[in-house]
Amino acid sequence: MSYQNLTKHTPYLYYFCTIQNVISILEFGILSRNKAIDLGVFKKDYDWSNRQIQLYRKNTSIALSSGKESSVHDLVCTFFSPFNTTIYKAQEILNIKGGEYSESSIVIAINIEKLLTNRDKAYAFSDRNVGASAENVNYYNSLSDIDKLDWAVINQTYKKFDNYYDSAFKEWRDKKSSEFLIENIIEPKYFAQLLCISEDTKAFIQKNTQISVEVIKNLALY
């Protein structure tokens, strides 16, 4: 099975959401941005993303494993590790907006083997964050290319730098946030576990799902 090319590096994909969105995700699944808007479940008030970056992603098309070309906004964007700078940036934005990120942040772990055993799932992946400079990002749609990603960087936990503005950090940051993209939806049946930072968040989630919930304190940036 081609999914084994990926599971030798990580058994899970990871998706960041907030406590305000998790109930609808447990009901409908993780939806692409466009599909969430079409179904009327996109909550603009809880959207932490950068508007300019989202415009760039909307206008970025990627060739999928099915042969189809899709806008990033028609894809569910996941990561290979829960420790990546995009998730940390989301926590920082939540904190600035006045929300308590340790209570709001949730990471969904997605079972790769179950997901990719479904041959109807079209996908692609990148060797850097999709929001990085276009000339630096390579896209792939065959798992035979998965070893082209920098797994030493991807599988590191968070790393401190002396200078967070130089090219060394930016290169590490973009590789750390390489993405795996699935067309339209990841259904709840593929969710393996929900990760959160606080016991209160765990208690809230457990009232709404039978999926395993684990508290991991070092998911927090601060």
Language model regions located:
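Active-site-proximal loop/hinge segments that shape catalytic or ion-binding/gating pockets
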Residues: M1-C77, N84-Y222
